[in-house]
Every structure is written in C-alpha cells, then in structure tokens.
A protein has these predicted regions:
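Short helix-loop capping/hinge motifs at secondary-structure junctions, enriched
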Residues: 63-72, 118, 145, 230-236
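Loop/turn elements at helix/coil->beta-strand transitions in domains of secreted/extracellular proteins
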Residues: 44-45, 87-92, 163-166, 198-203, ...
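Extracytoplasmic "Venus flytrap"/periplasmic binding protein-like
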Residues: 1-30, 62, 66-73, 165-167, ...
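Hinge/lid segment of periplasmic solute-binding proteins
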Residues: 2-54, 79, 104, 194-206
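Glycine-centered hinge/linker elements that transmit conformational signals in sensory
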Residues: 82-86, 122-150, 198-203
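C-terminal lobe and pocket-closing loops
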Residues: 177-186, 190, 194-197, 210-297
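Extracytoplasmic/periplasmic solute-binding protein
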Residues: 41-50, 55, 79-124, 131, ...
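Short helix-initiation/N-cap motifs at beta->coil->alpha
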Residues: 75-80, 149-162
Length: 297
C-alpha cells in the first residue's frame, strides 16, 4: 500500500529505476495522475500503481428521503440526520471507536481531511487549531450516537445490515455482501439473507465536507506493485507488465468492488480497463456485476 512505497524506496528496499521503467513502458498517461504523484521519488515513480478504492459514507437513502433530510455530504447534514433518526432501536451512527484498529485511523483521517485538516504537514496541528477542534467535535457527535463499546468495521457492518443504523463509514468492499452475495456476512434486515433489498435502499457518498472546507475531501487507498532491489528484475517486470496489461482485468476481478482501476486504459483505448472493470462480477457465493446491483449515480 501507499504507506510503504516511499519509506521502502528511501531505505533501498525498492528498485526505483526498475519500477519507473515499467510505468514508462506501460505509458504514464494511461495511469491516474494522482496514483503516480503519490509514489514519486524525485522525478521517478517508485512503485507501479495497481488499483485503489475510495472510502464512503454508506447511508439509508430511503430513511433520509422519508425524513426530508439532505444526503450526508457534510458535517452539518450528518449531524441533522443523527438528531432526526436516532431512537426506537436505531443508532444515529456507528462510528469507529476502537483506537488500536487501523479502521479508526482511516475513518478519523477522512473526517479530518473533510474539514481541511492536514495532520502530516509540519506545524499543522498548531496552525489549524480551529479546524481540528471542529473536526474532533463532529467526531464526538457521531461517536456519541453510536452504541457503547469499542467499535470497528465489524460492528458497523453488522448494525447497518440489521437495519439498526442509517449511516456508517466503510470501504466499497461492503458492496457485494450488502447485495446478499456473501453467505458469511449476509444482510439481516429481513428473513432472506440473499435479498438485495438493503442494497436498493442504500446510497453512497465519497466526498465529505466540514464547515471550514467547502470543497470537502475524499479518502482513498491505493495499492502498488514494487520490484525490490534483490529481485529478478526481468521476471518481476514481466509479471507486473502482464498483470497491468493483458492480465489487468483478471487482476481487478479478484475483488472488483474494492479494486478500482488506476490504469484506465491503453494506447488503443484510453478507457479499456475502466469499461471492462464495470462489467466484472462481484460476490463470493453468488455473483453479479456492480452495474446490475447499483445505479451509476
């Protein structure tokens, strides 16, 4: 993942020249610019971007519409929804509260970015006190709306699937089981674990905004292939080039709901892989294309 790319490049674990050569051969212009820029070491690309996903606010659009609420695109809208939809066995939100789980870091980072808080920049905490305070106060709102205890991805998914919360923050890896395609994690909102009812009532928001950042922000995770300094460079390069070109659709098919193509196409068709990905079946025990399960919007 991205968190290892530059540290491993700095430590000499990655062969930056070899990885950069693969990117150049595949064609820099065929990759999403952001995925390349995040892996830059000087003028070179330290690892080859493979795929990524964007974190989402997953919400019950049917309950929002019934209550006359705006979609949860902002701190303000989420706070209003928490107030309106809490009670009668319904938790207004299920936030991540287990501090030693990476999931909480992901959710908290998304909330901070939404309000324009940069915790990586040197001196940022002191200079962004107002934004940071607003972000933490908002996180307190969604944490207080949640059940007691240490919560992470497991509880948020279970409670959403049971119809006991109108909002959670999750990755798109939830999309196949949400549609009743995975027996080990079925929706329990009704008596049919294979039902697509909950999926049909669910909306997704990727860009969240706080009061100090009107543009908002998304949180994404990108995965990379990396040729190491002690690898058989020729063999490793050949494997990556196959996996990112002729075999790229197969690479994405491992879990299409969470493996969005960061290489959109090739020299023949700039959207070839995006189009192929949209038709890939998702699911474990049953399969269907995402385009059959969810509308484009």
């Amino acid at each position: 993942t991205l968190q290892y790319v530059l540290p491993w490049a700095e430590a000499g674990i990655l062969d930056v020249d070899a990885n950069n050569a693969v990117v150049k051969e595949l064609g820099k212009k065929t990759f999403a610019p952001g995925a390349l820029n995040m892996a830059k070491k000087g003028s070179k690309i330290a690892a080859v971007p493979v795929d990524g996903w964007t974190q989402m606010v997953v919400y019950r659009k049917d309950l929002f519409e019934k209550a006359g609420l705006e979609p949860p695109t902002s701190y303000e809208n989420i706070t209003k929804a928490v107030e309106a939809l809490s009670g009668d066995g319904m938790f207004g939100f299920v936030a991540a509260t287990k501090t030693d789980e990476n999931f909480m870091s992901q959710v908290l980072e998304h909330v901070l970015l939404a309000n324009g808080v940069n915790v990586v920049k040197k001196g940022a905490i002191r200079k962004q006190g107002k934004k940071l305070k607003a972000s933490l106060e908002f996180y307190k709102v969604i944490a207080n709306a949640s059940p007691p205890g240490e919560l992470y991805w497991k509880q948020s998914r279970e409670l959403y699937f049971a119809g006991k919360t109108p909002m959670i923050i999750w990755s798109p890896f939830i999309m196949d089981e949400l549609a009743g395609l995975r027996d080990s994690a079925p929706p329990t909102i009704n008596s049919d674990p294979t039902s697509g009812e909950l999926a049909s009532k669910t909306g997704f928001i990727t860009n969240l905004k706080g009061p100090n950042n009107n543009k908002g922000a998304a949180w994404a995770d990108v995965r990379y292939f990396g040729i190491t300094a002690d690898a058989d460079t020729e063999e490793a390069s050949a494997f990556i080039k196959y996996s990112m070109d002729e075999g790229y659709t197969k690479t994405l098919s491992i879990a299409p709901e969470g493996k969005f193509p960061v290489r959109r196409g090739n020299s023949s068709d700039p959207e070839a892989f995006t189009k192929a990905w949209s038709k890939l079946p998702v699911g474990v025990d049953r399969k269907a294309p995402l385009s059959d399960l969810y509308s484009e919007d």
